[in-house]
Regions:
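Short alpha-helical donor nucleotide-sugar binding micro-motif in glycosyltransferases
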Residues: 164, 280-281, 288-293
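Conserved donor-binding/catalytic core segment of Leloir-type glycosyltransferases
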Residues: 209-240, 367
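Aromatic "clamp/platform" in nucleotide-sugar-dependent glycosyltransferases that forms part
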Residues: 301
Length: 396
């Protein structure tokens, strides 16, 4: 699929799409998984569910963080094994052992990340067992301190790059990340397969925690994990700069480590009467927000290919997207909204105001372009490409 400069491929040089007749046992490995909330978790879960729908067997290995009452269970047809860590390295990397886990009947191992202990130990176990390994590189995380950036560079050279080079196939979500990995010294073919989304099938329902506003007051929505990555501070600063009457109401949906911070920040905001903090919403409520918002705002500091962007596009809702990791270019090329500089509250405020001032034809054009472009990102199409990679590394 070609979209502007975004070229998504899943076949190596000279390769044709592979058949998909034989059922496979696929092991998906990601540190975080349900009930943890995050884009990477959803990516792994949705691929797993789509593979199960096609008759494949899927197992997930993940760390038991946060601790869950069940260590082994089935969810959506996927067998989940949560591994208890002995400790948490740096607050983000669970120290786990996979020595007592069995992958003898696994056909292909699909790693989702490059650096964590779980990923590297599973890679070692799989290579010793002669199992083909596929690794997806999801994101380039921003470190806030000089020490953090230095450690990140060292870990990449010693661990991250080695994970990809030791794999039988590597996947990146966008052309931006392919170019980034080339600058980081990655060699060999990389498949470009985007993140996906599943349209919400439940009927839309207005969030119960969203106050009734006048019908004439447009709604702008933020949907996502409440974290430094997602740029909530930038969004709140932008709202303060809009004054006491911005001409719209902002709804913030999600939970995360900044939930307490957001509660305090909201209470002290000069625009607090125009902001509602909803907490975690259901899929039906999320769908309502997309379908009833003038735009969805994504002020992130770094992203792979966020699900909320794809879901908003599918709903025909214009998007205001921070220009991180090439995503501003995607929004502009498909014509689904506006791109703003990262960490720039004034530009974000201006973009939200511009959406409010747009006439019906412009709003319809943004929405229609996004809806049309979103079709190639639905999980059935994404999984087709992932299966092509599996068949290729299996030599089928």
């Amino acid at each position: 699929m070609i979209f502007g400069q975004w070229v998504f491929s899943s076949n190596g040089p000279g390769q044709q799409p592979m058949g998909t007749s034989r059922p496979l046992h696929v092991l998906l490995v990601h540190v975080w998984y349900w009930p943890h909330v995050g884009g990477g978790d959803q990516h792994v879960e949705q691929i797993g569910r789509e593979l199960v729908r096609r008759g494949h067997r899927v197992t997930v290995w993940c760390a038991d963080v946060p601790a869950h009452e069940e260590r082994r269970f089935r969810r959506g047809g996927v067998d989940v094994i949560r591994i208890t860590p002995s400790r948490l390295l740096g607050g983000v990397d669970p120290l786990v052992s996979v020595s007592d886990l069995d992958l003898s009947d696994v056909d292909v191992v699909h790693l989702h990340d490059t650096l964590p202990v779980l990923i590297r130990r599973t890679l070692s176990k799989a290579k010793k067992a002669g199992k083909p390994v596929v690794t997806t590189y999801h994101n380039d995380y921003v470190k806030k301190t000089a020490l953090g950036r230095a450690v990140k560079r060292i870990r990449w050279v010693l661990q991250g790059r080695r994970t990809i080079h030791s794999s039988d196939a590597g996947i990146v979500l966008t052309p931006f990340f392919e170019q980034l990995l080339r600058t980081k010294g990655v060699q060999g073919h990389l498949d470009i397969i985007p993140n996906g989304f599943s349209p919400v099938e439940e009927a839309p329902r207005r969030p119960s925690s969203l106050p009734k506003t006048e019908e004439s007051t447009p709604l702008i929505s933020f949907v996502g994990r409440l974290s430094f990555q997602k740029g909530l501070d930038v969004l709140m600063d932008a709202m303060d700069s809009c004054g006491s009457n911005p001409g719209f109401h902002l709804a913030i949906a999600g939970k995360g480590q900044l939930s307490g911070w957001l509660e305090d920040r909201h209470a002290n905001s000069s625009a607090k009467e125009n902001i509602s903090v909803l907490g975690l919403v259901t899929d039906a409520e999320k769908r309502w927000m997309y379908e009833n918002s003038a735009c969805v705002v994504i002020p992130s500091r770094f992203e792979g290919l966020p699900t909320v962007l794809l879901e908003a596009m599918h709903a025909g809702t214009p998007v205001v997207m921070a220009d991180v990791n090439g995503l501003g270019g995607l929004v502009q090329e498909c014509g689904c909204g506006l791109s703003v500089p990262c960490e720039d509250p004034n530009s974000l405020a201006q973009a939200m105001s511009r959406v409010m001032e747009a006439d019906a034809d412009q709003a319809s054009a943004w929405g229609g372009s996004g809806k049309s472009a979103s079709r190639d990102y639905q999980w059935d199409r994404v999984t087709d490409r992932v299966l092509d990679v599996y068949r290729r590394v299996l030599g089928e």
